[in-house]
Amino acid sequence: MDKEKIVIQGARAHNLKNIDVEIPRDKLVVMTGLSGSGKSSLAFDTIYAEGQRRYVESLSAYARQFLGQMDKPDVDLIEGLSPAISIDQKTTSRNPRSTVGTVTEIHDYLRLLYARVGHPVCPNHGIEITSQTIEQMVDRVLEYPEKTRIQIMAPIVSGKKGTHKKTIEEIKKEGYVRIRVDGEIYDINDEIEIEKNKKHSIEIIIDRIVIKEGINTRLYDSIEAALRLADGYAVVDIMGDKELLFSEHYACPYCGFSVGELEPRMFSFNSPFGACPTCDGLGTKLEVDVDTVIPDRSMSLNEGAIIPWRPISSQYYPQMLASACKEFGIDMDTPLEKLSKEELDIILNGSKDKEFYFEYKNDFGMTRETWIPFEGILPNIERRYRETNSDFTRDQMAQYMTDLPCPSCKGYRLKEETLSVKVNDHHIGQISEFSINEALAFFDGLELSEKETQIAAPIFKEVRARLGFLKNVGLDYLTMSRAAGTLSGGEAQRIRLATQIGSRLTGVLYILDEPSIGLHQRDNDRLISTLQSMRDIGNTLIVVEHDEDTMMAADYLIDIGPGAGEHGGRIVAAGTPEEVANNKNSITGDYLSGKKFIPVPAKRRKGNGLELEIIGAKANNLKNVNAKIPLATFSCVTGVSGSGKSSLVNEVLRKALARKLNRNHAKPGEHKEIKGIENLEKIINIDQSPIGRTPRSNPATYTGAFDDIRDLFASTNEAKVRGYKKGRFSFNVKGGRCEACKGDGIIKIEMHFLPDVYVPCEVCHGKRYNGETLDIRYKGKNIAEVLEMTVEEGLEYFTNQPRIARKLQTIVDVGLGYIRLGQPATTLSGGEAQRVKLASELHKRSNGKSFYILDEPTTGLHADDIGRLLKVLQRLVEENGDTVLVIEHNLDVIKQADYLIDLGPEGGDGGGQIIATGTPEKIARSKKSYTGKYLKPILERDKERTEERIATAKKK
């Protein structure tokens, strides 16, 4: 067996056409090809699946039943496999307890650091809380030079009111001759005037010593006596200098604030020993959001100002509100903004104990009457959310609630005792709020004692290494407290990549899925060098990628195609990037060599003269941003990772437009106002989420073509004779579907410690319908055969049915002619799902008042796919007069835009400002813009190519 290669023979997963391929080991290998060509089928569903399966098979049957079993891939032979680790975008943790710090293990090292070198500080008095042995106290005092005069005291009263006569009498009985009261020294026999109503501090003076050789025993005895008298506390007054407070306890001598023994678990917000008891370590509390409950205060109660109590299904709450308003004299026709503070308080928070007469008439005409206090809208929503057993009700109430920082821990997630432990005046929560760059600077400037430095050295080494890896993959703007669930797919993947680099494993096969997603061109070089360093320590990297820089940096490039779906699944070219670029059969090669390219538009649109203006956006890291978006244009928001693009577009603009135009309850990010919304009628967010969560959803159902197809089958003569309506041809309802498999076509057989087996239904043989339904044919085919057609075949088949043909044509236009009409939604990639959504929008009639938002639509798309996507987006603007706004890093998309908004200059706190706006040419001239710097050579190169192409065409 050749140990230098991974040999694959006869791979047939999904659309792979029985392919053979050899992949060099210990190299950076990039797999590319059109979206849907079979890259993931080869990389993840064949190579990774087999590597993982072989490892799991080595375990006992008992252990295997607890692990996610991989199906044996459809392949004849794979040799030369190493243990495989998959780093994709789908396995991001959505657990609210996961943060960047916990995922990268940096937080674990910080917990260890604080447990070993942290100093507890009383939050009330700001003094350090220490626990020391008498030997440590003696050693500390003897650090002072000889002839230093000291007095040892026992603090027996600390900040307490009273004359304390009894205490002084007891001191006298003990035989002590001097005391200090409020800083003044008295003889015990003096007449000491102590005011009863003032707070006082009293210390017994145990001994006065001059530091010299041989005083150790006397010093030890005196401190021991002080500790005994003052319940474990002693004060050593260094004459002419400061006082030292010693304690045998981890407790403040003034207020008794105590901290237990420092342990790593005390600094974990996922442990009951460290988590804030108010929020259970989540850092937030779910509270009812008044602005979501009453989004428009210019409306009256009768106009439905209170969204959750609108009389849609039940009349119970509207009737209760009317009765309460009658009792408390609140006018239901007055806009809420004109009601008095007291009236609004009753509506929102209730009438407390004051009861009112309530007569309720239900839908059946029955009347019930009672005297009850008015609960109030906010407590009502909170109670229903907390007490309900219905998921539907909980989801309904959750729409009106928002996460606010916990009032006890201020969002730091940890209990007060934990947050009192400091290193260099910072508690662990404050360090977690640092960005990666700030954390690196903090640890570089940390000042510790010699002993502490020795203890912390191995911890610093690990923390610095992990922070460095995160910086190298372009994530230096993230904070360690950032919740893992809020990260984009690309960010989450690069974090896992950084974690793997930190483990420094060798001999491993890493399989990555587009690690460059969401990464600005500026940070691409760092990512590529990170991948190369993983290769250099002895690992094989297989990267599914479309980014040109990554492809050119590969040791070996595999192009899978030539087309997508049925037209793909073959190895078109394999070799060095230069060899692939010169391969005439490779579309990827044509783009790498410049034979094919996406042209620069001849002119930029100015729009229709109207614009959308965002004023005072402050969500996340946005710094009071004002931005204008010209309507009827193709606009693009750019900027380095973390600069605030998603905050501006998704958090502020999309949510504000959805709230106004779609009556959505989502609360927009902080901003002053948005002008020009009246020029729009609908907002459409086209993301890469699946078009359906179950295999029952498919492209035909999503685009609405299946409705028309069912109508067509129901209108055939045979269907009319049998009395079949359109519902007969649905696989979701009883009647026409096969009841043995409930219209799924497959039956799941659970195998416990083996993977579940899916077998075709024995009754319908995978066709989903019963025999009677399949008897109905249109142009020789039944409904099951139609669902098995590709979209291209369907378009030809339904060419005389304009309603269906129009919908199928748009799917072909977005480059998805190869997918099957009945292909389960769960088998579509993110890029494919996004284009199905685009297709369903394309066939709708538009009046030019639609606003489309796309967040990184090029994810998973080859340069050829991007060309097709851009034609569709330009068509929405050109033909319909609609507005398209895209968040994007891909320079091919950016250069085609009419208008750019570039955010920056950096990520995180260093971003959130608009650096430049205008046409791509204007941005390219900007000295401050990183986007402009990388865009300029691309514009120049592609303008030359476009001119050459035009000149060549003219000669012909």
Curated annotation (Swiss-Prot):
UniProt-listed InterPro entries: ABC_transporter-like_ATP-bd, ABC_transporter-like_CS, ATP_grasp_subdomain_1, P-loop_NTPase, UvrA, UvrA_DNA-bd, UvrA_inter
Keyword Nucleotide-binding: yes
Compartments where found: Cytoplasm
Listed PROSITE patterns: ABC_TRANSPORTER_1, ABC_TRANSPORTER_2
Ranges annotated as C4-type zinc finger: 252-279, 738-764
Main subcellular location of this protein, as a coarse class: cytoplasm
Binding-site residues, ATP: 33-40, 639-646
GO CC list: cytoplasm; excinuclease repair complex
One GO BP: SOS response
Keyword match Metal-binding: yes
Domain (ABC transporter): residue spans on this chain: 309-587, 607-936
Matches recorded under Pfam families: UvrA_DNA-bind, UvrA_inter
Function: The UvrABC repair system catalyzes the recognition and processing of DNA lesions. UvrA is an ATPase and a DNA-binding protein. A damage recognition complex composed of 2 UvrA and 2 UvrB subunits scans DNA for abnormalities. When the presence of a lesion has been verified by UvrB, the UvrA molecules dissociate.
Self-association and partners: Forms a heterotetramer with UvrB during the search for lesions.
Record family assignment: Belongs to the ABC transporter superfamily. UvrA family.
Name of the protein in question: UvrABC system protein A
